[in-house]
């Protein structure tokens, strides 16, 4: 086959070419002084058990079949080299990276071995050795690029000097050509920020802060235009030249990138069809009778050649046989034998360097918590809409109540009791819901960030949860005081300053409980909309059972009465009822005494309503406060446990 103009290796790599198939770990380093490293993957297979039918079909759901996602995959790569893993969707590219990085969940069966410098790593060592960049870039949108990297450095590295972090961040900003956007916001779809390519480089920069020697990137060019994708790949090639191992999965690379990669691997249905240098690829497929046509993109040509066409049964059988032929030819080729020889050789060399773990000198638990708290606070404080809604959403609800009730009366004929009961019912029912709205809107992004950063070993998920809780407390207190100050005095509730304080404290608790209950559920349920529905259902149910406003508690069935003791609404309602009705005197028209002929005027004092609705609540006032506020630390501790379990399940 005639050599194509864009396939010339000299124009792409020149003297930096480092593609030898034989191991060169004992020949020196890429940079002349640093030790060379190697990564070997030997006969890695992964299978999972899938249920035959859907969950509602009990018979077929009980039946399982084993699905082989990876089948005896073997790779070898050294420092200074970049490997590109090609394959169509579902070919096993991401699963292979997960297997190499130790991130595969234990719900499947993993076989085979992964060696770094000839040493087989334990599962708990992969996180400290391999840097893994996922497809999606997850950032806090209101932070600048410099702040994002600085907080990451502060979470990963211990130092008593601020200059240390500044120098570390400046170094990676320069290395990845991000200095010109260092002080720009990351941004999101709501407001502009840096470009997609720059976001990808920020993700890479965050990984470089710990100086990893093995970097893996899953689809780093997804969603980028051709020119930006080309720049990202060239950047990764340059990073590999600095004594790093770089492995990337790419779905559809440009032809100009063909000779920039030192190794190219092709996966089809979990089987390795080829793995070698670009020159070896051209020769291998040429010998198999499939030369790349002139002026064709070799990536596209070989991807089509090694894919199974499922448009028709005949084409599927034909293309699958071709793939099986190519896979068999590769396993019998000298290229495959050299891979296995290199892996075996590195396992027995005595002069190999130590395993290249990332820089690991993390700060203490409380230092990390402080960094997370500062980061969360700075990010959310810059979002004006978030700050305003946090402070005034309760007030907006209160204004509707004011416009509706105007001012409560002491005249029984004008609904003195009914208006107060309706008001308290709305207050206890709505405040948890506003707390839930805060958590549903703000925490999912923090959860996504913590899911990614905790897998990188920066901190544990419960620490992010606790940072959010500490951040939310002052906002909730201020918002409740603003709401109470306007509503309490405007609506004409019991005119006493101490009662106003009790009123505010009683409404702060359900607001926090609603928000923290939502956090607990967000640790168990991924979809925020489902969490929204669950919290709303629990809030309404608790209000019906525990308040005593809809049905007298003494007349409830015993199971519901017992269940009411586990609802925070019971204690909150009793506090508010005592706080408002104790010492209150009613009138009936112009009379201060009861009118026997008028059932609406049967009460003259608020204590009568207390004993009818919440018997004994007056003597339990302090106890109710203690029980009500005990829900808050209970939910926080439960949330920490849930996120600890979430951490474990994601890493399984």
UniProtKB/Swiss-Prot annotation:
Topology term for the membrane: Multi-pass membrane protein
Q: Name one GO cellular component term.
A: ATP-binding cassette (ABC) transporter complex
Biased-composition ranges, Polar residues, are: 18-30
Q: What is the reaction catalyzed?
A: cholesterol(in) + ATP + H2O = cholesterol(out) + ADP + phosphate + H(+); sitosterol(in) + ATP + H2O = sitosterol(out) + ADP + phosphate + H(+)
The entry lists its GO molecular-function terms as:
ABC-type transporter activity; ATP binding; ATP hydrolysis activity; ATPase-coupled transmembrane transporter activity; cholesterol transfer activity; metal ion binding; protein heterodimerization activity
The task this protein performs is described as: ABCG5 and ABCG8 form an obligate heterodimer that mediates Mg(2+)- and ATP-dependent sterol transport across the cell membrane. Plays an essential role in the selective transport of dietary plant sterols and cholesterol in and out of the enterocytes and in the selective sterol excretion by the liver into bile. Required for normal sterol homeostasis. The heterodimer with ABCG8 has ATPase activity.
Protein name as catalogued: ATP-binding cassette sub-family G member 5
The lineage, from the top, is:
Eukaryota, Metazoa, Chordata, Craniata, Vertebrata
């Amino acid at each position: 086959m005639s050599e194509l103009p864009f396939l010339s290796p000299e124009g792409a790599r020149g003297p930096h070419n480092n593609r030898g198939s034989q191991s060169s770990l004992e020949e020196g380093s890429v940079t002349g002084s640093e030790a060379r490293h190697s990564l070997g993957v030997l006969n890695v297979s992964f299978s999972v058990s899938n249920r035959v039918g859907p969950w509602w079909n009990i018979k077929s759901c009980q039946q399982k079949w084993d699905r082989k996602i990876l089948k005896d995959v073997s790779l070898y790569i050294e420092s200074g080299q970049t490997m590109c893993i090609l394959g169509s969707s579902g070919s096993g590219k991401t699963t292979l990276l997960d297997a190499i990085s130790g991130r595969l969940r234990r719900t499947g069966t993993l076989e085979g071995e992964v060696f770094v410098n000839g040493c087989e790593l334990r599962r708990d060592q992969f996180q400290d050795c391999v840097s893994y960049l996922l497809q999606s870039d997850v950032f806090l949108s209101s932070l600048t690029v410099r702040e994002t990297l600085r907080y990451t450095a502060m979470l990963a590295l211990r130092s008593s000097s601020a200059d240390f972090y500044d120098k570390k961040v400046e170094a990676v900003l320069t290395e990845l050509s991000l200095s010109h956007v260092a002080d720009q916001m990351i941004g999101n779809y709501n407001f502009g920020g840096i470009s997609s390519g720059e976001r990808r480089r920020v993700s890479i920069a965050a990984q470089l802060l710990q100086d990893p020697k093995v970097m893996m990137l899953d689809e780093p060019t997804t969603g980028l235009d051709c020119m930006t994708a080309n720049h990202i790949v060239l950047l990764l090639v340059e990073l590999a030249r600095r004594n790093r191992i770089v492995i990337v999965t790419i779905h559809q690379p440009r032809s100009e990138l063909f000779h920039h990669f030192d190794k190219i691997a092709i996966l089809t249905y979990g089987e390795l069809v080829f793995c070698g240098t670009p020159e070896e690829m051209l020769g291998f497929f040429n010998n198999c009778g499939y030369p790349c046509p002139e002026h064709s993109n070799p990536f596209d040509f070989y991807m089509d050649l090694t894919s199974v066409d499922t448009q028709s049964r005949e084409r599927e059988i034909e293309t699958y046989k071709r793939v099986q032929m190519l896979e068999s030819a590769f396993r019998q080729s000298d290229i495959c034998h050299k891979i296995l020889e290199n892996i075996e050789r590195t396992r027995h060399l005595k002069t190999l360097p130590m395993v290249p773990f990332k820089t690991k000198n993390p700060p203490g638990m409380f230092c990390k918590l402080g960094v997370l708290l500062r980061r969360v606070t700075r990010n959310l404080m810059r979002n004006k809409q978030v700050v305003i809604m946090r402070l005034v959403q309760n007030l907006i609800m209160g204004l509707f109540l004011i416009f509706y009730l105007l001012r409560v009366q002491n005249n029984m004929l004008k609904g003195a009791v009914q208006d107060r009961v309706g008001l308290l019912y709305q207050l206890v029912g709505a405040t948890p819901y506003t707390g839930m709205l805060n958590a549903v809107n703000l925490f999912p992004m923090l959860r996504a960030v913590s899911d990614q950063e905790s897998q990188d070993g920066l901190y544990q998920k419960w620490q992010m949860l606790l940072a959010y809780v500490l951040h939310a407390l002052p906002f909730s207190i201020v918002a409740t005081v603003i709401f109470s100050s306007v509503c309490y005095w405007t609506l004409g509730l019991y005119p006493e300053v101490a009662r106003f304080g009790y009123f505010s404290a009683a409404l702060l608790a359900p607001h926090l409980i609603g928000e923290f209950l939502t956090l607990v559920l967000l640790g168990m349920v991924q979809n925020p909309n489902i969490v929204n529905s669950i919290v709303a259902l629990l809030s309404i149910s608790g209000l019906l059972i525990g308040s005593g406003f809809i049905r007298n508690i003494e007349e409830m069935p015993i199971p519901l009465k017992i269940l009411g003791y586990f609802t925070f609404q019971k204690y909150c309602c009793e506090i508010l009822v005592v706080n408002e009705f104790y010492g209150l005197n009613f009138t009936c028209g112009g009379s201060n005494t009861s009118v026997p002929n008028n059932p609406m005027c049967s009460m003259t004092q608020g204590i009568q309503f207390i004993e009818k609705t919440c018997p004994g609540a007056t003597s339990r006032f302090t106890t109710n406060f203690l029980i009500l506020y005990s829900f808050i630390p209970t939910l926080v501790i439960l949330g920490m446990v849930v996120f600890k379990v979430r951490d474990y399940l994601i890493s399984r």
